[in-house]
């Protein structure tokens, strides 16, 4: 069975966060999102809205399509 999209998105977000040298707390502060929410998203435990994906993409200096292109 194909890997859950939530897991793939979470892995992508974690990889970007680590590449930027950010902790989950730093990422949450920079993006204005809750740390525990982001932690759950990174683990593939929560769905993420398109609005929050756009916030995250902008926070990393990416377009939404670029953010999701490696998912």
Go through the PLM ranges and name each one.
Residues 61-71:
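Short C-terminal boundary/hinge segments that cap the last helix of small helical domains
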